[in-house]
């Protein structure tokens, strides 16, 4: 939980909620703020499992997962490849389409579209709501 990304605060909230829920179920929990170099602390703790509550860069992109795998520590969350891939929305869509998984219409919003965004949306025939 915690970490270095801009989502540090929400990561703490997630981590605390998960920690509390696990404790209520009788699990022994050690909370770890994954900021800076935390590998030595992981080695000392020798966890049976890491519940990954990190958000954003480093937590969801495969970085922490690769550290845990290199230390042979099991973890919750998608693996390194799936996590990294999920951060690239356009590439994920291409893979989904290739595997016949339905995806909504989309276009990549560029900074240069700022002046004519309504025209771009109309040209692409994308209807509201837009995410």
Predicted regions mapped to residue ranges:
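Glycine- and acidic-residue-enriched helix-capping/strand-helix junction motifs
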Residues: 1-15
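Active-site nucleotide/adenylate-binding loops and adjacent lid/helix of ATP-dependent enzymes
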Residues: 1, 42-44, 85-131
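A short, GP-enriched loop/loop-strand-helix hinge that lies immediately N-terminal to
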Residues: 3-4, 47-87, 102-108
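Glycine-rich, highly charged phosphate/nucleotide-binding loops
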Residues: 27-46, 58-59
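Conserved dinucleotide-binding and phosphotransfer motif residues
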Residues: 25, 71, 99
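Hydrophobic alpha-helical packing residues
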Residues: 22-23, 68, 96
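A short, Lys/Arg-enriched amphipathic alpha-helix followed by its capping loop at the start of a domain
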Residues: 17-27
């Amino acid at each position: 939980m915690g970490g270095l990304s801009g989502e540090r605060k929400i990561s703490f909230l997630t981590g605390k909620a998960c920690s509390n829920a696990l404790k209520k179920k009788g699990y022994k929990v050690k909370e770890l703020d994954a900021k800076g170099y935390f590998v030595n602390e992981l080695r000392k703790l020798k966890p049976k499992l890491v519940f990954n509550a990190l958000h954003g860069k480093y937590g969801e992109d495969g970085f922490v997962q690769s550290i845990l795998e290199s230390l042979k520590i099991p973890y919750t969350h998608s693996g390194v490849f799936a996590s990294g891939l999920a951060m690239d929305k356009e590439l994920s869509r291409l893979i989904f389409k290739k595997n016949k998984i339905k995806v909504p219409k989309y276009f990549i919003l560029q900074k240069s579209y700022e002046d004519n965004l309504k025209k771009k949306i109309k040209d692409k025939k994308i209807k509201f709501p837009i995410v």
